Each structure stands twice: as structure tokens, then as C-alpha cells.
């Protein structure tokens, strides 16, 4: 029987929202069972919160409510792992055929899982990405094949053997942002395709401003800036590193902090190994990492 491990890193999430996401997952697994066949599914939550979200009684009730559609496992990390390290911790001993990574605030439509797993039947495909709504990711993709340059891991499925082959996420470099970009590019560097599946829909609960744009928090600004500099360094873009450091040094406190952290890593010899020196995979197009189909308002 084919096996799938679904995993989410949680941090201070509301219990009710997580239960809603689990209920939607149960439905999408049921649809797979009815339309395709048997699939053994494990759902793993890695809790990086300072205080645990679920009690033992909650875990027991969740498994009862899942009614053998899938097994729920709850891991307490005991520290703020970030997404990259959290997913590595959950995935390091995974023996399933496939791994699915989801943000905890993602709600799947019933056929989402079925449609992504169908794409992964192709041995040349390494990862399948769902379409997020209400904010669909703007990056370009081939409308005939679905092939795209990288995937957001808000909702993706990939082959476990590839996760092991490329040694998972680069948690030493990326805490939150750009870990999925780096992960995707290394999958392609290993010879596999990234496929965007627009018919596989995942509702991602981002909070929008009144003008329809997305307003990041201070922590999001810091980790995003830090990751942008480190990604450019790792993927052989020294001019981009210089430019970003200059721009962020003139920015707000969160951006200035990101530059200081980069300089500290440099002094301590903690920067990542530079790869893709011929720029075969990684592309830096201004502030984007591939062509975009549209822009969000700011």
C-alpha cells in the first residue's frame, strides 16, 4: 500500500483553526480512497510553541474522530525550530513513499491531494504544488505541463526519496523564508521537475489589508530580509548580496538587523557553501526569482 506523511510546523496556532484544517484533510483523504484506492496516511504536527497547543486528551480525540482515515501524531519540539528545521525533524525518519508539507492555516479542497499525487506518478517529477487561494502565487508556469521554476511549500507533495537525496531543507541557513525556494532549486539541480497543479486548490488564510494587499509583521520583514541575503549568497549572486545589504542598511530596524546578522555569520564562518556557480538553476530577476504573471498591490 502506498504511504503518505503529511506534516505541519505549528507555533501558537489556535486549536480550533487546527482542528478545522484536520477535518478538511480527512475529507481529502476520503476522496482519494473513493476515487483512487488505498493510501496509508500519517499526519504529523511538530509543535515549536513555548506552550503546547494540544493535550494528550486532544490527541486521543483527534485520532478517534479521524476514524482510521489517517493517524495523527503530535511532536513537541521544546524550542522554536522555524519551518526548515521543524520539517527536517519530522521528515528525518519518514519511511512513507511521499511527504506532504502544509502550512497549518491551509484548508484543502476535497480533491487537492488526489490531483497532486496523480502528477507525481511521472518519474521525472519531484514535487507538486497546489494553487493557493485567495492569494494565488504570481509566479509563472507552463500552462500545458504545469512546470515551474520553484514551489511555495505552503502546500506541496514530493517523493520522500528525493527529500533524503538532497538532505531536506537547509535549516542551518534558512529559518523561515526562502527555505522552499532553495529546496525547490536543489530538487531541480538533482534533475527533477517542479509541477504547479492549478486544479489542486488550497485555501491559505493570509490576512489582507483594506486595499487587498498583504502587510507583513516586523518578524516577517526581518526573516524575509535575512533569507533574501543568504539565498543570494548561497546561489552565487555576490552583486545581489551587496545590493541587498546596501538597501537594507537604509531600511527599518528589522532590515538593518538582518544585515548585521549576515555580517556576523560571515565573521564567524557560518555562511553556506556557494552552489550553482554557472547559474544553471537559480534566477534573480530584481526582487523576484522567476517571471511573474501579475503583481499584488502594496
Task: List where the protein language model places each region.
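Glycine-rich, basic loop-to-helix element that forms the pyrophosphate-binding segment
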Residues: 76-94
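A conserved acidic beta->alpha catalytic loop
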Residues: 44-58, 106
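Short, well-formed alpha-helical segments that are part of the catalytic scaffolds
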Residues: 13-35
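Conserved donor NDP-sugar-binding/catalytic core segment of glycosyltransferases
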Residues: 106-142
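A recurrent flexible, glycine/aromatic-enriched loop bordering the glycosyltransferase active site
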Residues: 139-158, 176, 181-182, 212
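Non-catalytic, C-terminal membrane-associated alpha-helical segments of glycosyltransferases
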Residues: 9, 13, 222-223, 238-298
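Short aromatic/hydrophobic "clamp" motif used to bind/position activated sugar donors
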Residues: 99
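A short, conserved alpha-helix in the catalytic core of glycosyltransferases
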Residues: 156-158, 162-167, 173-201, 208
